Structure formats: C-alpha cells, structure tokens
C-alpha cells in the first residue's frame, strides 16, 4: 500500500501550525503498520540548509501553468526512514514566509500541478494520494478532472483532510481560468465557484474519494452553520464520504520520560520530579518558588479562535486566587498587549513570553499544573494532548478535538482527565478554573487525576490504524 502525502508544510522541514506536526508524525506511525508513505512539499528557502543538503536532485521536469512551462526540480531525501520529495522553484518558494503573499493562488496552483506532473517520475507507484487543507486541495480536483484518463493516474484514489475549515484558499476566477486552465463549466456553485471567486478547499471536498476531519466532534460541527464557514451545506451533501479521525502526538518528541528539553525527566510514578520542573520554570520566569501555588499556563497562538476574549474578561478575577500564570505565544497585537499589561500589573503572578521557543514550551508543559485552552473552535488541538502526556491538567471548552480528548473529572466516580465547560461564556470558564483550583488543593485526588492523564495513550497508533483502514477500503 503506497501513499503519497501532498502537504504545504511538514516537521522537521518547516512549520507554521498543527498541519506540519501531523505531516511529520503520521507517516512514521503508518510505516510501523506496513504502509509505505512518502511526502511531497515545496522546497522553501526557509527549510534549514542542513536538511536541504541531505537531498539530491532526482529529476528536472517542466510544469505547464497557463501559457507557460515552469521549471520544477524534484529533490529527494530521507528523514527518520521516510522518503521526502521537495519541489524546487525559487520564484515561488524563495520567500520570507510560507503564506500570505499576493500570489498565493498562483504559488499553490503551481505546486498542485507540480505534484501531479511529478508522479510518473517518482519511481513510486502511488495507490492513494492524500492531500491536506486548501494548499493541496486542488491536487485531488485536478487529478479527477484532468489526469484520470492517463494510465499513470487512473488507479489512484484520493483522501482529503480538513485541518482547519477557516482557511479555504479563496482566489479570483483568473486563477482557475488562466493558471489551471479550467473552463466556465467549473465556475458555478456545484463546482469551484464561491461567492464570485474560486475556492480551492471546495475543490478538494467535491473531488476526493474520502474526506477526513481531524476529530469526530469537528466532523459533526462543520456540518452546522456556526462552524461551517459557508461550506456546511456542501459538507452535509458529501456527508457519506466524511469521517473524523482524531490526531495524536509524536511521542518521540513529547514524552516526559525522555524529553531532553526539560529539567527533570519523570513519569506517572515519579511526580516529585514534575515538581522539580515546576521550580525550574518559576526560576526561569522569576516567579516566587511556591510549590502549593498552581501554575496555569497557555501555549498558544494569541488569536480570537483560542478563546482569549473569555480569558481577558475574567483574568483579574482569576488573579484574585493564589495562582501563577504563564503565557507563551504570539499573534494579534491586542492580546499580546493585554497579557504584557497583566504581567506589568501582577509582576509576582503573571509572566509572558511573546514569540515561540520550542525548548521553553516543553518546560512550560512539564512545569505547569493546569493548561488553559478555552477555544471558540478547535479542529483537534495538540496543546491539550501534550499537556495530558506531561500530567498538566487541561481546562478546555467542549468543542472539536477538545471534546474528544478531554473527559471532565467526575468526583463521584473519579473518572476523567481534565476539566471542561460547554458554553462560550467567560463566567462558565471562570467557574471551571475555580473548580480545578479547588481539586488541585486536594492532593490525593489531584495526584490520581494526574496519573490518569499520564497513563492514557495519546500517540498516533490508534489514528494511524484508522487511516490504514480508510486507505484499504478505497483499494478494495
């Protein structure tokens, strides 16, 4: 079974979000199950030179794009036992950021066509082409509409994964006509047309043999208007080929027993070492070293989606409690400035790191007691899974993957691995935070809760089995 992942980002090459984590970890887990997965992505200038140096030039081809033929170098390399192909074209990929350029429609039209034009030259018989998010959605659409009659492609099945429905790749009709050479028959509501523009993600949904969302709850949510980003009707129409498979975490990267980034390695039976990480975290940020004061942390993009309006509304009420708060992330200036002001107002209780620091993030996960993630919506979420693996108890809103992975603590049965609330309401969140703090001070209960969180399986194994089953069903 041969699978080709077409992605716009992938760990360890480049990362802007959770898509890169999935693209980096899932193929390794699938390989353990006997599935041969190879990955194709752009050769961005942002990829570390040492990783590019590990690749060799496999072949040079031309990619037809509108009236032009564009250069396409196919670089080939291996990382952690997985074969990668990097699509080389400096005009499109020698940029200072992955996305957000005036010509993104052209860049990813080129990449989509390049993926398809490369397939006969990869020395790899592709059974299933698995595309991800808007950037590669048109790979599946073009395969069905333009390449399916070619013997090199006619047997290939397609899977399309929605990581975040909010970003759809909406461009002017000229992208469809001039670059992809698709005619008027594709510019209507049953095809690519979307409020006067063309929508790449819509193409992926329409044309793929199977669609997955990154959690079962998100799969249901996106079929409703509130979460559907104007594609809910289309997703209801194609419900029969839509499924939800929750993400995992790469346990070779996120494992408190082996993590080289944290001060003291530990497991569920050596929680005293977790306290050593807490002290180290307090020292790093210059917080008072109080073992009995819970640290509430957030490692997040500072955006509206992450529920920061709720946090902002009741933050001072949380500060009335004996707590410490650590924020690590960057994003919208209004939230950055708010948390910086709170750090100024509560210097003994609040510390903020604007930006991202991988090593520090691991220490925050290991040294915190509670992890706050009150998202407005959350397709899957990795933060809560990492927190759980490190015995840092999540407080989440019941949406998307948060609902699928965090079970609210039940004091009657002792079951659960975190705390959750349903409504997008600041005082519901505050009540849940206060409830979590109350249980934190009940040490026997808390230690049991932490052990329950740490002993569950958050790896990719179950998810990889589900994907393997999906691929197999397409080939039968």
UniProtKB/Swiss-Prot annotation:
Gene Ontology MF terms: alpha-1,4-glucan glucosyltransferase (ADP-glucose donor) activity; alpha-1,4-glucan glucosyltransferase (UDP-glucose donor) activity
Gene3D superfamilies: Glycogen Phosphorylase B
Single Gene Ontology BP annotation: glycogen biosynthetic process
Annotated EC: 2.4.1.21
Catalytic reaction equation(s): [(1->4)-alpha-D-glucosyl](n) + ADP-alpha-D-glucose = [(1->4)-alpha-D-glucosyl](n+1) + ADP + H(+)
SUPFAM superfamilies: UDP-Glycosyltransferase/glycogen phosphorylase
Keyword annotations: Glycogen biosynthesis, Glycosyltransferase, Transferase
Main enzyme class: transferase
Pathway as given in its UniProt record: Glycan biosynthesis; glycogen biosynthesis
Pfam families documented for this protein: Glyco_transf_5, Glycos_transf_1
Annotated positions binding ADP-alpha-D-glucose: 15
Function in brief: Synthesizes alpha-1,4-glucan chains using ADP-glucose.
Family: Belongs to the glycosyltransferase 1 family. Bacterial/plant glycogen synthase subfamily.
The protein's name: Glycogen synthase
Organism this protein belongs to: Bacillus thuringiensis subsp. konkukian (strain 97-27)
């Amino acid at each position: 079974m041969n699978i080709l992942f077409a992605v716009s980002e992938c760990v360890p090459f480049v990362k802007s979000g959770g898509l890169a984590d999935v693209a980096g970890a899932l193929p390794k887990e699938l390989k353990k199950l006997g599935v041969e997965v190879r990955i194709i992505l752009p050769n961005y200038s942002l990829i570390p030179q040492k990783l590019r140096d590990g690749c060799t030039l496999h072949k040079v081809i031309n990619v037809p794009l509108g009236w032009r033929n564009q250069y396409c170098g196919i670089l080939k390399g291996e990382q952690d036992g997985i074969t990668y192909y990097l699509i080389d074209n400096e005009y499109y990929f020698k940029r200072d950021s992955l996305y957000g350029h005036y010509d993104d429609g052209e860049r990813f039209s080129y990449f989509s066509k390049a993926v398809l034009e490369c397939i006969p030259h990869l020395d790899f018989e592709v059974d299933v082409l698995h595309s991800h998010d808007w950037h590669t959605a048109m790979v599946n659409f073009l395969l069905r509409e333009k390449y399916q009659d070619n013997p090199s492609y006619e047997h290939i099945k397609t899977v399309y994964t929605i990581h975040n429905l909010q970003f759809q790749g909406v461009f002017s009709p000229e992208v469809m006509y001039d670059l992809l050479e698709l005619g008027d028959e594709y510019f209507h509501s049953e095809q690519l047309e979307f409020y006067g523009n063309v929508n790449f993600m819509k193409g992926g949904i329409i044309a793929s043999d199977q669609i997955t969302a990154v959690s079962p709850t998100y799969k249901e949510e996106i079929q409703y208007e509130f979460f559907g980003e104007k594609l809910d009707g289309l997703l209801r129409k194609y419900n029969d080929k839509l499924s939800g498979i929750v993400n995992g975490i790469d346990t070779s990267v996120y494992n408190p027993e082996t993590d080289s980034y944290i001060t003291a390695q530990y497991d569920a039976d050596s929680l005293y070492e977790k306290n050593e990480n807490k002290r180290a975290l307090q020292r790093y940020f210059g917080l008072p070293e109080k073992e009995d004061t819970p640290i509430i942390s957030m490692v997040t993009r500072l955006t509206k989606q992450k529920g920061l309006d709720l946090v902002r509304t009741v933050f001072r009420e949380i500060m009335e409690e004996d707590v410490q708060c650590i924020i690590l992330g960057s994003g919208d200036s209004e939230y950055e400035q708010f948390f910086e002001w709170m750090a100024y107002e509560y210097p003994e209780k609040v510390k903020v790191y604007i930006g991202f620091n991988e090593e520090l993030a691991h220490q925050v996960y290991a040294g915190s007691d509670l992890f706050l993630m009150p998202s407005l919506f959350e397709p899957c979420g990795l933060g809560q899974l990492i927190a759980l693996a490190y015995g840092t108890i999540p407080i989440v809103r019941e949406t998307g993957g948060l609902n699928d992975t965090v079970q609210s603590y039940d004091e009657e049965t002792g079951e659960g691995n975190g705390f959750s609330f349903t409504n997008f309401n600041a005082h519901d969140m505050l009540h849940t935070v206060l409830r979590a703090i109350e249980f934190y001070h009940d040490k026997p209960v808390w230690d049991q809760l932490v052990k329950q969180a740490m002993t569950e399986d958050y790896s990719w194994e179950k998810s990889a089995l589900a994907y393997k089953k999906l691929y197999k069903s397409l080939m039968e």
